[in-house]
Design a protein with these regions (language model features):
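Extracytoplasmic low-complexity, Pro/Thr/Ser/Ala/Gly-rich segments
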Residues: 1-51, 56, 144-145
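Extracytosolic low-complexity repeat regions of secreted or lipid-anchored proteins
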Residues: 59, 63-145
Length: 145
């Protein structure tokens, strides 16, 4: 399963290794799949694959409502699920969920063939809480309960 594996700094690599080492061997009825790049920062489940990528760019809240690459529009509703704040970027082929409140960003891509995409992303929240520390600064106000 091809998944991008950007070069990580030492701290991000340490956090991502902690995240991936604690991921389950299956989520619901979807078994883990082998990834071809960066198994210490990536994972995949099922067919079509739900992917988990650790260490990508951290999206930022932007002063524009239009958004853009790496930019979360100010009027976006963030999802607080199991103590993790997720930004959900809907797409026609997949929904992409990215943590907004963690030291290292974790992105979960859920193909549109799966119903209730947020619930699939939430399958990884407990692992994120246990392995990826909360950021102390720069957390969007929408991430607070």
């Amino acid at each position: 399963m091809p998944v991008a594996a950007p070069k990580l700094g030492p701290r991000a690599a340490q956090v991502c290794l902690a995240v991936t080492s604690q991921l389950p061997s299956a989520i619901r009825d979807l078994p883990a799949r082998k990834v071809t790049a960066g198994p210490e920062q990536n994972a995949a489940y099922g067919e079509p694959p739900i992917t988990v990528q650790c260490g990508g760019p951290q999206p930022a809240m932007c002063a524009t409502l239009a958004g853009g690459a790496g930019c979360v529009p100010l009027d976006t509703e963030l999802l607080l699920m199991n103590d993790v704040c997720w930004y959900a970027a809907p797409g026609t082929r997949a929904n992409v969920f990215t943590t907004m409140d963690r030291e290292v960003a974790v992105r979960v891509t859920v193909p549109s063939t799966y119903a209730q995409a947020a619930q699939w992303a939430n399958e990884f929240s407990d692992t994120v809480v246990e392995t990826d520390p909360s950021r102390t600064t720069g957390v969007p106000s929408g991430c607070r309960a």
